[in-house]
């Protein structure tokens, strides 16, 4: 379907501002069905080639498919797929001589079973299968001597692998963090580090048996072992502390740090004397801007080398271990006010970081080898593509988004800043905000407005392709988004501005105070700046913390809105702490737990204001959500129903907290249709 055809689907006629239900369905199917993105770039050791992963939606089959692609780094030849893309292929990793590429595949019909393969590149040979693991394979790395391939995989307790739960043993629970959203129970299937001979002559060997989870394994330069991150201390479930560990191929695991902070994403130096990593020193305060550190193995001491840039090096897209490009230089990426850039850092911290990429876009992952920087980057009107940067010059290698652009004609943002809604002294007192004009925009008309609030709250909106905004704008809505206090991408004080009022280190306003003021300030500014935004037809929506904000605004400022959609929300802070898969970290964010300060948790809870809700509400929640459990939605729905409020509740079976991002394609399209129908009905002229 071409862009002109999509405009017809959007139905932006002379008298209509939003589309009809049948058009909503087709619009949702068109945009969801064309979703595609590149990721996980891997540069060959000599810098000549780049491998990456392309993931696309197959709407007809209601699934996702991914395949590994390969291109010359100089763009001299068109990229080509290395795998068929009929399954979920990923995690490419080069052999040290660049002649083999390891990758994973979900080709098995058994749920969770994943295979690890190596494929010859530029030479004769056949695909070789190294391992078949029952519970996933990730973080694939080739040892520097070429003899081993390492990976992570969950080790299952046989007591809980039976076909029928009636035969399973009862689970003995003694710690928090027993379950994880999207994974289910994890304490009885911890993630371990495995190695397998690269020639396939032996079975994989588990290097980290036991109850502790190990992540981010990276090889020492002499191939004698790996460095990982794990929480193995007493009371590990009561704080955010994680230590770096040395995991030898033979011998005992040894901690390299001593529970003084949260340290992860290790990267040993080329000479083996240091380990770069991402983290921070205080495991009892969150959020903090994650920094790049360098640990001296001889002394056990570390220094922070990114302090010249007060931004987080653990981005909304995730964190990636710093890459050494020499004995004294590192490359890492960090967020910056709605963008994410790659930076070069002095490994001593003597000079400030220098940006290697720029522009109004978000880099989502990167790799460096052989003098070539490869990035996976997205901008608002184009999905994530692969580019190389050599000598400051960029070259785009992939073009997988061409069909999406042709079929859906993505729209662009207008960025603007707004003064904070209440006093702020930690940095520039301004909020980054964006507005997207409706498709077929006519300045003489007035359009309904949808105010979006992101989750987290310690994440950011920004300069990247976002299907939510594209769908809403294509349906005829003006789309407003912002990064209020509490968001990431700014100085640490910005993120910590809404820490709990009694937090022992960095007390803030708590949730539901400065953040609310900022969101409303952005809405006021957008309406004042743009006469084509109709202030009498404003809707609001958000998910997770954004759902929290939606319910809070419904109770405190419902008169500002015609309708509000609250998705996967936190509605009751007290019950959220005792039921969420990560609820026990609330105290590092808010200070006391709910047992020590129930009054403050009640003050921050949107459910407290349910009697004051007068605006129609749509509640959307996933039945397998462990981050914000279904009970959060049920509490709000039951309360509103008992009070005779206007409320509609949709439950998505089999989905988790990630419904809007990686839920089944059919459910993602149905969700869009439900949201568009709701706001078209309530925001009609």
Model-derived features with residue positions:
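Multi-bladed beta-propeller domains
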Residues: 13-37, 70-88, 110, 118-136, ...
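Cap/lid segment of the alpha/beta-hydrolase catalytic domain
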Residues: 234, 400-536, 543, 576-578
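Active-site-proximal cap/loop segments of hydrolase catalytic domains
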Residues: 482-685
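Predominantly five- to eight-bladed beta-propeller fold
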Residues: 15-20, 65-66, 154-196, 241-242, ...
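Conserved beta-propeller blade repeats
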Residues: 35-50, 86-104, 126, 132-149, ...
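Short, solvent-exposed loop/turn segments at conserved positions within beta-propeller repeat blades
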Residues: 60-65, 108-114, 184-190, 236-242, ...
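Beta-strand-rich domains and repeat architectures in extracellular enzymes and scaffolds
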Residues: 30-66
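Asp-box/WD-like beta-propeller blade repeats and closely related beta-sheet repeat scaffolds
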Residues: 109-192
